[in-house]
Amino acid sequence: MYHGQKLAKLGRESHHRMLMLRTMVTQLIRHERIKTTLAKAKALRKEADRIITIAKRNTRLSHSLVYSYVTDKQVIPKLFKELRLRFGDRPGGYTRVLKAGSRLSDRSKMAYIEYVENDLVPLRDYKANNSKFAVIRKPTPQGTVFNFEEKETGKIYSSAISLNNRFKRLEQLKKQSTSSSN
């Protein structure tokens, strides 16, 4: 039974899970946006909001609690000088989780977690510039077919090809293009 379960287990033992979340909170403070799996992002949201709430108190106890939690001490000044002031009037909800599709290798759901009110490039522009493939959805009488268009070359790959064969084919095309240019 799952009564009273407060945190997802994430397939790890408790000490490994807590260390992973501490490390991810530290990286989130440093970069203000990270990409991870959806389950980890949801678990991380709770911890990241808790650390910001502790930092907003700005007491000696809050400094020692944050100092013992964060894995890299170089991010502590950013937390107390920048993030604490940014979220001073906000009562909660310091992070947002944005879904980012599926990972190609194992099809696990991915997500971005970021602090709200940040100065980063908006995520729509960020994804559009860094995506290698565009997904083309084509409805057919048999069902919906998904094709992948490579943005650099404009070539379209059918979803009937397995992922492994698609990557082998991409490697072959790269070899052909380098050999033809020589």
Curated annotation (Swiss-Prot):
The gene is mrpl17. GO terms for cellular component: mitochondrial large ribosomal subunit. HAMAP family: Ribosomal_bL17. NCBIfam families: L17. One of its GO terms (biological process) is translation. Signal peptide: none annotated. Keywords: Mitochondrion, Ribonucleoprotein, Ribosomal protein, Transit peptide. GO terms for molecular function: structural constituent of ribosome. It comes from the Eukaryota. This is Large ribosomal subunit protein bL17m. The lineage of its organism: Eukaryota, Amoebozoa, Evosea, Eumycetozoa, Dictyostelia. It is found in: Mitochondrion. It holds the Pfam family Ribosomal_L17. Belongs to the bacterial ribosomal protein bL17 family. Its main location: mitochondrion. It comes from Dictyostelium discoideum (Social amoeba). The keyword Ribonucleoprotein applies.
